[in-house]
């Protein structure tokens, strides 16, 4: 990777070895923040490994040192923090921070972890190294898919909502809502990679996917709703690379990545030998699955030829009798991370929020500058540009951008007018980042 190497092999191994779980009340603390920065470095290095070089040491290190279960636990812990503690913080009348960057880092932590898992779960040995926590990860992905199915609208805020006057905490809540959509889409990809490993999953995991959550039927609903597609001004748009992009008329029939992930997951869940002997084809399941026939066009089959087997399966399904729900007595494992964390912290959400208000999120200007300096060192511009899938976009209007903020060098704009309009939102972070750079 030459000059684009972010971490030396020895340095990456030290960071991986140091990964560990934190209690909910510790989120945002100094030690937690350091691990978050380390995770971001591992994240960027993993993307570089996957796109620039042949070797993929981050994935290998995570497997070797048994850290995939740690990442899964951290993922579910921050998900719980966002559901149980973050809303309490937002309601506290005596908490009106002028700078929400420390809280943003906790909110963003879930996105960082799921992004890393999406990058490395492509490899079967990573899924296998998750051990029992793959059950917890399946449940996590199921929760995110439910959010996608229930989602209404186009998946982001309107321009009026995005730029209307709001307090820093209200602004952070909007950002968290927009982030949740992207997190859920990445969870879909992780779930698809788990289904690639049907032959090595435990019976408990197979039962969780096929019976408890009935993922095949849920995926059919996802295809019907297609929350990553919308019509805007009469034009078709797909959500890709973190934003809505207009699809050229000549590309309308082209399969997008997220639809592809759903189809591959369906193929694995319905046609793998492990699934075919365990999935109970009830009247409801049959009715849902036969809806897929309308989507299996010749154009789609040209792009994913293996779906011809799924088409044959559905043609056969239409002719056979359905099965009554199975009532077998099965002794199986159940996910334990969410339940354990909830038991440990039940009735303490208010206390955790107040503790974090006093000891974690009320930082001095000096502490904020130091944090901004570490942030600037973590997000190296040359690496970010190397892993970016396309040219940068304007932070205000999302048009293609060619000019950076001259002060912090981290935010892009298409013109001076957009920069002026965005300054009210960007100003405080910009000043802190610039001060951090000068303090190096």
Curated annotation (Swiss-Prot):
Residues involved in Zn(2+) 1 binding: 394, 397, 414, 418
GO cellular component: apical plasma membrane; centriolar satellite; cytoplasm; dynein axonemal particle
Biological processes, Gene Ontology terms: cilium movement; inner dynein arm assembly; motile cilium assembly; outer dynein arm assembly; positive regulation of motile cilium assembly; protein folding; protein localization to cilium
Listed transmembrane segments: none
Zinc finger (MYND-type): 394-430
Function according to Swiss-Prot or TrEMBL: Plays a role in axonemal structure organization and motility. Involved in axonemal pre-assembly of inner and outer dynein arms (IDA and ODA, respectively) for proper axoneme building for cilia motility. May act by indirectly regulating transcription of dynein proteins.
UniProt key word Membrane: yes
A Pfam family of this chain: zf-MYND
Protein name: Zinc finger MYND domain-containing protein 10
Main location: cytoplasm
Keyword check for Membrane: yes
InterPro entries: UCP037948_Znf-MYND, ZMYND10, Znf_MYND
Assembly with partners or alone: Interacts (via C-terminus) with DNAAF11 (via CS domain); this interaction stabilizes DNAAF11 at the protein level. Interacts (via C-terminus) with DNAL1; this interaction stabilizes DNAL1 at the protein level. Interacts with DNAAF4, HSPA8, IQUB, RUVBL2 and DYNTL5.
GO molecular function annotations of the record: molecular adaptor activity; protein folding chaperone; zinc ion binding
Annotated positions binding Zn(2+) 2: 405, 408, 426, 430
PANTHER family recorded: ZINC FINGER MYND DOMAIN CONTAINING PROTEIN 10, ZINC FINGER MYND DOMAIN-CONTAINING PROTEIN 10
Compartmental location: Cytoplasm; Cytoplasm, Cytoskeleton, Microtubule organizing center, Centrosome, Centriolar satellite; Apical cell membrane; Dynein axonemal particle
Similarity section: Belongs to the ZMYND10 family.
Domain of life: Eukaryota
Gene: Zmynd10
């Amino acid at each position: 990777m030459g000059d684009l190497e972010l971490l030396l092999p020895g340095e990456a191994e030290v960071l991986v070895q140091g990964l560990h779980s934190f209690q909910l009340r510790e989120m945002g603390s100094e030690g937690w923040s350091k691990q978050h920065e380390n995770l971001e470095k591992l994240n960027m290095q993993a993307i570089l490994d996957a796109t620039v070089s042949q070797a993929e040491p981050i994935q290998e290190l995570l497997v070797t040192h048994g850290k995939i279960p740690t990442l899964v636990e951290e993922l579910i812990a921050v998900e719980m923090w966002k559901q149980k503690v973050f809303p309490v913080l937002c309601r506290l009348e005596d908490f009106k921070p002028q700078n929400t960057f420390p809280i943003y880092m906790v909110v963003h932590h879930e996105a960082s972890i799921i992004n890393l898992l999406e990058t490395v779960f492509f490899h079967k040995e990573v899924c296998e190294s998750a051990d029992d926590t793959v059950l917890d990860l399946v449940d996590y992905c199921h929760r995110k898919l439910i959010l996608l199915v229930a989602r209404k609208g186009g998946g982001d805020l309107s321009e009026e909502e995005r730029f209307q006057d709001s307090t820093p905490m209200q602004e952070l809540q909007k950002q968290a809502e927009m982030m949740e959509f992207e997190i859920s889409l990445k969870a879909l990809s992780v779930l698809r990679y788990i289904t690639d490993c049907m032959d090595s999953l435990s019976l408990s995991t197979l039962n969780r996917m096929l019976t408890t959550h009935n993922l095949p039927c849920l995926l059919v609903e996802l295809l019907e709703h297609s929350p990553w597609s919308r019509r805007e001004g009469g034009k078709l748009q797909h959500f890709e690379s973190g934003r809505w992009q207009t699809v050229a008329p000549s590309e309308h029939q082209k399969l997008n990545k997220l639809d592809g992930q759903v189809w591959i997951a369906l193929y694995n869940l319905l046609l793998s030998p492990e699934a075919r002997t365990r999935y109970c084809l009830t009247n409801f399941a049959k009715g849902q699955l036969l809806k897929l026939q309308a989507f299996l066009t010749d154009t789609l089959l040209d792009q994913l030829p293996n779906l011809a087997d799924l088409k044959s399966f559905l043609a056969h399904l239409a002719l056979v009798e359905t099965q009554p729900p199975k009532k077998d007595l099965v002794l199986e494992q159940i996910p334990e991370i969410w339940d354990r964390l909830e038991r440990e912290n039940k009735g303490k959400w208010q206390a955790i929020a107040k503790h974090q208000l006093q000891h974690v999120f009320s930082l001095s200007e000096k502490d904020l500058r130091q944090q901004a300096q570490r942030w600037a060192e973590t997000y190296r511009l040359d690496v970010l540009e190397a892993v970016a899938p396309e040219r940068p976009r304007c932070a205000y209007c999302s048009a293609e951008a060619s000019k950076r903020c001259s002060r912090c060098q981290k935010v892009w704009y298409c013109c001076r007018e957009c920069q002026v309009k965005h300054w009210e939102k960007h100003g405080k972070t910009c000043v802190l980042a610039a001060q951090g750079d000068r303090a190096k």
